[in-house]
Structures are given as structure tokens and as C-alpha cells.
Amino acid sequence: TEIAKYGLKSFPFAIDGVAVAVNPENAVKSLSKAQLKDIFAGKITNWKQVGGSDEPIIAYQRNTDSGSQNYMIDFMGETPLMDAPTELRPGSMSGLMDVIAPNDGSLGSIGYSVYAYAADMYGTGDNIKFIKVDGAAPTKETIISGEYPLSSYNYAIFRADEPEEGAVRRLAEWMTSYDGQLAAAKAGYATVEDIGFDYEE
């Protein structure tokens, strides 16, 4: 594998998705993957083009060193993300949620964040609304089943020559232990235990 070629070892320890969030007053409830790509490519610029009100779309992105930004780049595939000005790149996940939450001028906003953070750590309530993608809402269940299309594994990656009794190996073993998986679940992540992942395969 590509990882092994560089002398590294990897394994999944949790599963998460990227949730697409809009202002709760936005009438649009679902987007297709193609529509979502066109929005963040700058091809769809008004909500009326996807069944919403006549409101310009304000598409927020994350910083280039953000995990959710890198996931969105992967999701876009050969379709490049449009260049977003600095003011449309909040520096934190909470900052992204804040600009989407109800305030003057936020009705047309759309953005994305790690599901575990947006749903369990930041909270939704009346502040934001998750958009369905291809008819599937982001939940732990749909992320685990793969029904929600913007889901992926989180991997631990370390050098393959790390000592067996070293701190790195011990941490890796803990991440896949009962306590480690419980910690991941409490943080809002779906765990590899949920799908019966076999580390011996």
C-alpha cells in the first residue's frame, strides 16, 4: 500500500462524516452530491436554483489545514473548490457554526464541519440545520451504514518500526481498546467497534 511504501503503519479507530449546515430558516432540506459540488465550485450561486428562496448563496469553507477542508477537497474530486476570500474561511469549527446561525445576513449561508463536533460538541438546536445529502441525513447510524455519502474513517498513522513497547504503540493499542473506543464514542464519533472491524484481517 501507499502507507507501507513509506515505512508507515495505519489503522482506523473511528468513523465520522462531514455535516453540511445551513441557517435553520433556509427552506432547502436536501441536496444531491452533484448540487453540493456545484455550490462549492461556484456554479450554483442562488438558493432558488436548488428549490429554495431567491437568496444568494454564501458558501463558507475552512482553512486549508483543516481536516474537514481536506475531506471536502477529496469529496469534490476533479471539481476544484472555488477560491473563497479570507472572510469566508472561519478559523475554527465554532466560528463556522456561528456565521451560519441566525443573524442578519446569514440566511444564504452554507458550510461544513466534522459531524461529531457540530452535532455533539457544539450542539444544533435552533442554531443550525443539517442538510440531507442524496436524501440521507448525517447521523451516527447513517455514517456507520455508509448511507450518508460524506463519511470516512479516521486513521492513526505511525512509523512501522516503532518499538513494540514504546509509547506510540501503547497509545495505538489504547485507541482500539474498550476504553479508547468508549472515549471516541463519548466524543461523538462512531467507532470501529460499531461495525465489528477485525484488526487481525
Predicted regions and their residues:
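Exported/periplasmic ABC-transporter solute-binding proteins
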Residues: 1-201
